Amino acid sequence: MTRETAILAGGCFWCTEAVFQSLSGVDGVESGYIGGTVADPTYKQVCGGDTGHAEAIRITFDPNVISYDDLLDVYFATHDPTQLNRQGNDIGTQYRSAIFPQNDAQTVAAEAGIARAGADWPAPIVTTIEPASTWYPAEDYHQAYWDGEGQRNPYCMAVIPPKLAKLRKGFAERLRAD
């Protein structure tokens, strides 16, 4: 079975993870850190804004079921790519909108995805395309957060359901049947 990986940063990784784990063809979503200068960063370090890392998700997907372009379209529809270094009340470079292509084809697709999404937003897209770098999985308690603690977390309850509603409205045909 062919599997590919996509790494996307779009604000809080709990919120982004909840969206992508709902998609058919996505085998796994892991929260983590990428794009910084500190080896093995902790959540506390990344939240401090001094490591250069973004909170991101690493998506493992079946390209025969869902394409990288489809993932990018969902990504741009379910976060605000016009906000520089923030998503809502989450402010700092760790919450930046960034794509970390894993190969040249993904870089080309990311550029095209930004161009496609530009028509859907009233302000310029500030999403960056950053070089692939070392991926650091977040601590275990951050993984599949929405499925557990997230549904008791007031922040998540305010942010994630509207993202999931956008996903259901715009990408119903891409949702998991289970």
Predicted regions and their residues:
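Flexible coil/turn and secondary-structure edge motifs
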Residues: 1-178
